[in-house]
Amino acid sequence: GFEFGFEGKGSLLVCLTRQALEKERREIRLFEEFKIPASMVNRDEALGLEPALLPSIMGGVYYPRDGRIDPRRFVVGLAEKASGLGAQLHTKTEAIGFESNRGRVTKVRTTRGELTANQIILASGSWSPQVARALKLRVPIQPAKGYSVTVENPPVTPRLPLLFSEARVVINPLGHALRIAGTLELAGMDFSFNPRRVAAMQNASAEYLPGLAEAKVIEIWRGL
């Protein structure tokens, strides 16, 4: 194994209003149906689980089996493990075409030469439909753009990963930093950056956790 910051303390969905709390109460029945542990918590119980929250919250839902990781450490760790087991990683290499023989793909043409393999897996995420067109295949994937903002040394550091119901934002503690993630834009392969989305996420989060609107931003990310 390898260390990637895993903590399995659960997660807490937080509501500011009674309307949101009632909506989550109705949805929790689905979790019960699939035997996924989840429990409604009132304001005092939520603050007991996560003292960093503002006392103006109404309550929420606690998911005891949830956990958190540091995504970068996880991906880097996987790459290092794979390399140690003999895998070859071709970074900064773009697939630009294929060669096939009798209905089987035998080679991948890349910006750094050809790669030959017995089996080829297409796992290009949002780019899969574009790559698959070269094979006359239709892959039903729709790109969805999301954003994250990482702030340094926030005024408070939550114990748990948090989900903010009304703001539709997720909070992941990362040591001396805090990552705020959310939004979903269905805009095709659009890599443009919308600063209003980022500001809205940060400002909305400040209604649940103190001081986030003024916290120092060290990274803004968007991806498909």
Give the residues covered by each predicted segment.
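Short aromatic/hydrophobic contact patches that present stacked aromatics
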Residues: 11-13, 60-62, 148, 168
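Active-site substrate-recognition segment that forms the wall
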Residues: 1-5, 95-106, 113-224
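Dinucleotide-binding Rossmann-like beta1-alpha1 core, especially the glycine-rich loop
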Residues: 1-43
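Helical element adjacent to the flavin cofactor pocket in flavoenzyme catalytic cores
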Residues: 22-34, 53-119
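Alpha-helix N-cap/helix-start capping motif
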Residues: 18, 43-44, 72, 93, ...
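General small-molecule cofactor/ligand-binding pocket signal
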Residues: 39-41, 88-90, 218
